């Protein structure tokens, strides 16, 4: 599988993926052609590519379909159980992926909220690859997601959404890093982000013009 970086905020991801079935456990460079290979890496010698981590997991799939108003919604649920290995280090994989196959994206969030009400789930936008890079080089992990630049002419609802997405995404990455290494400062920063997010949501009623 070749995955582009795409966009991922607070567990909701949009990206391109290419899948191939290989007969051998070896990278087939012929598959990495111009149809999928990033233009920015066109001068890279693919023969120099070497594995620095591996993922070994079992995936169980199920299709969930229901009616939402007059529209049909289809979601593929995939449960991944296994591990990421980089040298002598390894990390367990226990992920539930929800992929929207048909319908409105809002339905995907509604399903996730219903599942989280009964199961110990937490949104997370950290990929298996990012876990592998972190095992190989702990300094490669970025706690703060890229912040959107706000301008004076940015609409109020756009500014509110940008700040909320940043705080939500950053808080989840802090929680994930705290789970990984247990540094108390990360816990303190995580709680502060949650407080900032709560304050932001509380100020919404004051910022929205009244009719």
Where are these regions (language model features)?
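Phosphate-end processing signature that detects enzymes handling 5′-triphosphorylated RNA
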Residues: 1-211
């Amino acid at each position: 599988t070749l995955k582009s970086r795409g966009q991922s905020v607070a567990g909701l991801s949009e990206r391109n993926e290419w899948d191939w079935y290989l007969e051998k456990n070896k990278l087939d460079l012929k598959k990495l052609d111009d149809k999928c290979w990033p233009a920015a890496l066109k001068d890279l010698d693919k023969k120099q590519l070497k594995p620095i981590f591996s993922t070994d997991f079992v995936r169980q799939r199920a299709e969930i379909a229901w009616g939402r108003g007059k529209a049909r919604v289809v979601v593929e649920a995939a449960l991944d159980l296994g591990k990421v290995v980089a040298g002598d280090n390894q990390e367990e994989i226990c992920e539930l992926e929800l992929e929207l196959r048909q319908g409105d994206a809002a339905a995907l969030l509604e399903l996730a909220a219903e599942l989280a009400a009964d199961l110990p789930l937490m949104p997370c936008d950290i990929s298996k690859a990012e876990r592998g890079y972190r095992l190989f080089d702990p300094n490669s992990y970025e706690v703060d997601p890229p912040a959107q630049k706000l301008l004076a002419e940015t609409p109020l609802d756009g500014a509110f959404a940008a700040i909320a997405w940043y705080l939500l995404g950053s808080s989840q990455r802090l929680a994930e890093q705290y789970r990984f290494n247990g540094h108390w400062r990360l816990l303190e920063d995580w709680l502060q982000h949650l407080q900032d997010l709560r304050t932001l949501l509380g100020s919404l009623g004051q910022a929205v013009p009244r009719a």
